[in-house]
A protein has these predicted regions:
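Acidic/aromatic-lined carbohydrate-recognition and catalytic surfaces
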Residues: 2-182, 188-191, 202, 213-261
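Short loop/turn hinge sites at secondary-structure boundaries
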Residues: 116-120, 261, 281-286, 292, ...
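A Trp-anchored, charged/polar loop motif used as the substrate-binding/catalytic surface
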Residues: 183-196, 296-302
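Structured alpha-helical segments in the cores of large, soluble enzyme domains
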Residues: 193-205
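S-adenosyl-L-methionine
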Residues: 215, 289-290
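Aromatic- and acid-rich polysaccharide-binding/catalytic face
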Residues: 263-285
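Single conserved hydrophobic/aromatic residue that forms the stacking wall/gate
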Residues: 305-313
Length: 313
């Protein structure tokens, strides 16, 4: 197994949130043309790689992390041809582009889900996780009830508009609707995501930062089965796209790199929202610093924010 693409060894990333980065057509929303216009600026900062937040077609119920079409650029940002031009212009300046891959769920407007929620059986009936009956909604899972033509509730990963894709269950606790990871329909989900990756790599993308990379297989506490899926993806990259990078949002480098085969893990410190801790922090009662009763506790803020290395002194 190749350790990592050479360019990743000295990559300095600049994150771009497309909708607020640079608007060139006056509609109040950033666009691909705006990103292209700022490539020299990005390079002037010493950055030689860009992590581009989701740019796919989406109803934007979750900032683009609810994908309606993985193979189409959202019209608010431009076209597929515009994105290819961004790849080309960035490469001319020695800048790599990582797209944000969202493999754990889609929008509830994705064509796969529109087919899956029908009563009639199709190749997409098991693309998402449905129970057998609308009366079956185990409390340990996030389920949306009574919204589909078919009899059953569907699992979501986060918001109600983000149905979870079905990569199977490592531990089967409800055999009437939970599929094992080696079920053909679960394997088909993984292959569909590989197909998405190939689509953009063939157009010039340099790899992917993977959103919620550890969320694929359910009832997989040690992430053994999830890691196996990513090993398969890594094998595909090493064989077909050896210069492409695979970067995880996992926050566990041991599992992400050593077990799952990612080249790198974005390690995020989930300290919460500093503003909330000032005004409405309530993990153990009202401990906000500015508690209206004068009983605020500054420790939560001072421990995690005031001592941070980037805090001005």
């Amino acid at each position: 197994m190749i350790f990592m693409p050479n360019w990743l060894n000295d990559a300095v990333f600049y994150e771009i949130y497309p909708q607020s980065f640079c608007d060139t057509n006056g509609d109040g929303i950033g666009d691909i043309e705006g990103i292209i216009s700022k490539l020299d600026y990005v390079k002037s900062l010493g950055c030689n790689a860009i992590w581009l937040n989701p740019i796919y077609d989406s109803p934007f119920m979750d900032a683009g992390y609810d994908v309606r079409n993985y193979k189409k650029v959202a019209e608010r940002y431009g076209t597929n041809d515009d994105l290819v031009r961004l790849f080309d212009e960035a490469h001319k300046k020695g800048i790599k582009i990582l797209l944000d891959l969202v493999p754990g769920h889609t929008s509830d407007q994705h064509e796969w889900f529109l087919e899956a929620k029908k009563a009639a059986k199709s190749e997409y009936s098991n693309r998402y996780i449905f129970t057998k009956s609308v009366w079956d909604a185990p409390p340990q899972y996030r389920m949306m009830c009574g919204l589909c033509e078919r009899d059953g509730n569907y699992m979501v990963n986060y918001f109600s508009s983000q149905p979870a894709l079905n990569y199977g269950f490592h531990e089967i606790t409800h055999p009437e609707w939970q599929l094992p990871c080696d079920h053909p329909d679960c394997l088909a989900t993984a292959e569909a995501m590989k197909d998405v990756m190939r689509f953009w790599l063939d157009k010039g993308a340099d790899g992917f930062r993977v959103d919620m990379a550890d969320s694929l297989v359910k009832n997989d506490d040690n992430k053994i089965a999830t890691a196996k899926i990513w090993r398969g993806v890594r094998d595909m990259l090493d064989t077909e796209y050896p210069n492409a990078a695979m970067v995880a949002e996992w926050c566990n480098p041991e599992r992400a790199i050593n077990n799952a085969g990612f080249h790198m893990d974005f390690y995020l410190d989930h300290y919460g929202n500093g503003y909330s801790r000032l005004f409405r922090y309530g993990e153990f009662g009202d401990q906000a610093v500015f508690n209206p009763n004068g009983k605020g506790d500054i420790k939560a803020v001072s421990y995690t924010h005031l001592r941070a290395h980037e805090t001005g002194r």
